[in-house]
Amino acid sequence: MKHVFSVCLVIVALGVTAGAQAAAAGACEANGKPAKLNFTFNDLNNRKIALSDFKGKVIILDFWATWCVPCKAEIPGFIDLQKKYAGRGLQIVGLSVDDSLPTAKKYADAMKMNYPVLLAEGKEDILMAYDPIPSIPVSVVIGRDGKICSRHLGIASMDVFEKEIASLF
């Protein structure tokens, strides 16, 4: 009987641990910092777009550049997420950190990017606002409440993004 109790206790402990890990993997921090959305950039049509225009939506800010191979690898996944979740309030925003308008526009057109691409070239203040951005890609997930849910340095799995944004709808 003692052996059966021990086995049951181990099974319960493993179940609780696995459940907590699964919840943590898909949930956002309850005490996320407020996202700084007080920045305005030109888009690929040379129109001024403010990040604050996207308040009330679930936002993925993607810091990237045309020469960045991991950035290029992530873009098709972001295109798919935008298609799948736009109707539920997702807005992916690409921030091209060091490309000129003609270079970024040509690249975005070739990649068939279906979300706003904003030119952040020479805008070090945005890089500092989301903690120092040491390298790219960096993606920041922001909830409808304007709080940062997560920050991904380097390439991240679209499954991870999907779990995070699902917890925000």
Question: Where are the regions a protein language model picked out?
Answer:
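Conserved segment of the thioredoxin-like fold in thiol-based oxidoreductases
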Residues: 83-123
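N-terminal "domain-start" segment that seeds a small globular fold
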Residues: 21-52
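Thiol/disulfide oxidoreductase modules built on the thioredoxin-like
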Residues: 107-114, 120-166
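Positively charged n-region of N-terminal signal peptides that target proteins for export
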Residues: 1-4
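Bacterial N-terminal signal peptides
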Residues: 6-16
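Conserved redox-active cysteine motifs that mediate thiol-disulfide chemistry
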Residues: 63-80
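Short pre-active-site segment immediately N-terminal to redox-active cysteine/selenocysteine motifs
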Residues: 57-59, 63-67, 135
